[in-house]
């Protein structure tokens, strides 16, 4: 058989649109960042992954995994981070890799505030990939694979169709919202909550990070609130936040499907 036909209409697909198979969802956060005592160091990426996977399950889009790297502003010192260039380089590799299976639209779900500057570089990254897209395949086996992909995904190799969007969600660091989401998705440890205070762990609300508070008035404002209002863990609230994130992300999938 020269070509193999995939049943693109099978299974649960948003609006019963098989073009959703050309959309990939990527989670971006931070793997190495302190979040007090009741949340793990990889809270951000776990939240982003949970949202991204549920968006993929709900719509039929492809879940493409996570971005390993993360960046942060120099004045915020609560973890181990990479440069903005490191993230863009990794994103380029991920996008090029998955474009080989017919994906040409990519939604990045970011749950780490330090990655905010990535959004400023998305259009530039998109143009770079469009201008440098190359089909791999030198052996007969590789060329046969490409032929089968092209048969099922007619836009394969059409660089003008490559489209990247980023949706960011931000909450006060290791405070009520993240704790409530953490409880809902199973990463919060209730037995460690009694020590989860900014007095014990300065990164909570950035209360104990003077350089961050001095350099960013929004961080300082949030820190003052955290100092005066103790964190509250509410699983129902966490569920509401997750539902909101998933639904807002799904709208991006719908926007992708409307593109010609």
UniProtKB/Swiss-Prot annotation:
It catalyses: 2-amino-5-formylamino-6-(5-phospho-D-ribosylamino)pyrimidin-4(3H)-one + H2O = 2,5-diamino-6-(1-D-ribosylamino)pyrimidin-4(3H)-one 5'-phosphate + formate + H(+). InterPro entries: Creatininase-like_sf, Creatininase/forma_Hydrolase, FAPy_deformylase. Catalyzes the hydrolysis of the formamide of 2-amino-5-formylamino-6-ribosylamino-4(3H)-pyrimidinone 5'-monophosphate (FAPy) to form 2,5-diamino-6-ribosylamino-4(3H)-pyrimidinone 5'-phosphate (APy). The gene is arfB. GO terms for biological process: F420-0 metabolic process; riboflavin biosynthetic process. NCBIfam families: ArfB_arch_rifla. The lineage of its organism: Archaea, Methanobacteriati, Methanobacteriota, Methanomada group, Methanococci. Fe cation 1 binds at residues 33, 44, 112. Belongs to the creatininase superfamily. FAPy deformylase family. PANTHER family: 2-AMINO-5-FORMYLAMINO-6-RIBOSYLAMINOPYRIMIDIN-4(3H)-ONE 5'-MONOPHOSPHATE DEFORMYLASE, 3-DEHYDRO-SCYLLO-INOSOSE HYDROLASE. Its EC number is 3.5.1.102. This is 2-amino-5-formylamino-6-ribosylaminopyrimidin-4(3H)-one 5'-monophosphate deformylase. Its cofactor is Fe(2+); Zn(2+). It holds the Pfam family Creatininase. Pathway: Cofactor biosynthesis; coenzyme F420 biosynthesis; Cofactor biosynthesis; riboflavin biosynthesis. Keywords: Hydrolase, Iron, Metal-binding, Zinc. GO terms for molecular function: 2-amino-5-formylamino-6-(5-phosphoribosylamino)pyrimidin-4(3H)-one formate-lyase activity; ferrous iron binding.
